[in-house]
Amino acid sequence: MIDERNSIAFHVGGGIGIPYGNSDILPFEKRYYSGGANSVRGWSVRTLGPGSYNGNNSVSEFINQCGDIRLEINLEYRTKLFWKVELGAFIDAGNIWTIRDYESQPGGQFRLDSFYKEIALAYGLGIRLDFSYFLLRFDMGMKAYNPAAGQDHWAIASQNFKRDSAFHFTVVYPF
């Protein structure tokens, strides 16, 4: 917390899932995904990664956009405006990768010598309605760096609002 009205939130998250026993791959529900309201907010849910894999964003494509390794970093500045309304400005970075090289996910395998080139960057603004016992978040994220193969990587240099933005509505309820 900076003062009564302003604060900075920082989050680093990561994980690795390794199949064991007679499994060659993690079950679908245990695999990581990236993009969405609690991830890299410049992408819609399950549309980022793995690695430099460039999915076609079709309805069935989300199955291929999951991985075994996840790394994400979020930095957010929050300020109280009035009543219960807060403004947030954020920067997100991260991606997912696979442990093995899969034919259906070209460019998705984690490689120590190049993974840093596949870390996506996003930025944006959000409005929060803080009702103490729950929070409503409305975030608009924009892609800054898109690691997908065949893309203009620095999206911030040639923004296309429809292609490079994502809107997220979230209800945060403490348990």
What is each stretch, according to the model?
Residues 1-4, 79-83, 130-133, 175:
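Outer-membrane beta-barrel strand-turn architecture
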Residues 16, 77-79, 129-131, 140-142, ...:
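Residue-level signature of outer-membrane beta-barrel architecture
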Residues 103-131:
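Strand-loop-strand
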Residues 129-134, 161-175:
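Outer-membrane beta-barrel "beta-signal"
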Residues 8-12, 87-91, 125, 136-138, ...:
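Transmembrane beta-strands of outer-membrane beta-barrel proteins
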Residues 93-110, 133, 141-157, 173-175:
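C-terminal beta-signal and adjacent terminal beta-strands/loops
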Residues 1-80, 89-112, 153:
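C-terminal outer-membrane beta-barrel translocator/porin domains of Gram-negative envelope proteins
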Residues 68-72, 120-124, 164-168:
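Transmembrane beta-barrel architecture of outer-membrane proteins
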